[in-house]
Regions:
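Flexible, P/S/T/G-rich "lid" or insertion loops adjacent to the active sites of thioester-utilizing
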Residues: 1-9
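Acyl-thioester-dependent acyl-group transfer interface
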Residues: 24-201
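Generic structural signal for individual residues within well-ordered alpha-helical segments
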Residues: 1, 15-16, 187
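Short amphipathic alpha-helical segments
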Residues: 11-20
């Protein structure tokens, strides 16, 4: 968090920047890297629902973005700010609600809707490189005796590695969930953090 503040970005943007920089170092093909970041909508739209009330923002790093970790973090911050602006989110939610209320969609058989949704998900997955989720600070009663939490992200054959972050007792745990044996990305990521003088255990 201290390093993020030094360059004027959020913790989420900083880690997304380090992650994208690390992916670029481990990839042979120089193509845009898309980091998907969940955004908690409760802060903007008060809700009592127990369901997931999130949307995703896609932060895209062009091959020309990778001058340094700092440059990647600043670019991540810029895109997150634009993509999470209330007017952008209002428009997204409005479009989603209109689609759900569309009478044509109401008469379409469920099996057809399910098939279309699956195709949509496949298309979205093809446009993402990795998911990074920061759950933020979690406070537990001392009586629970919890020293740390670990956030394990879901993976799939299309999304073989994801990164989760969670903070408790002033310490942040960053954990990669992998569906593959190769450890090059996690090793590169944590090495980059150490290069930035961030203690890694």
């Amino acid at each position: 968090l201290k390093k993020a503040k030094e360059i004027g970005v959020s913790f989420t943007a900083y880690i997304a920047g380090v992650l994208a920089f690390s992916i670029e170092k481990t990839c042979k093909n120089k193509v845009p890297i898309a980091v998907m970041i969940p955004v908690n909508l409760r802060a903007l739209y008060p809700s009592k629902t127990m369901r997931n009330f999130v949307t995703f923002v896609r932060v895209i790093f062009a091959p020309s973005s990778f001058e340094s970790v700092e440059a990647c973090a600043i670019e991540a911050q810029r895109q997150i700010k634009v993509l999470t602006a209330k007017d952008k989110l209002d428009a997204f939610i409005s479009t989603t609600v209109k689609a759900q209320r569309n009478w044509i969609l109401k008469v379409v058989p469920l099996f057809l809707k399910t098939a279309i949704l699956r195709l949509g998900r496949l298309f979205m997955r093809s446009r993402q490189t990795i998911i990074f989720s920061n759950l933020g600070n979690v406070v537990s009663p001392q009586s629970m005796g919890v020293e740390r939490y670990v956030l394990n992200m879901n993976v799939s054959k299309n999304n073989t590695q994801n990164l989760g972050a969670i903070t408790t007792n002033g310490k942040t745990t960053l954990a990669f969930t992998r569906a593959i044996k190769e450890t090059l990305l996690p090793e590169t990521f944590f090495a980059e953090l150490q290069k930035q003088n961030i203690a890694v255990k």
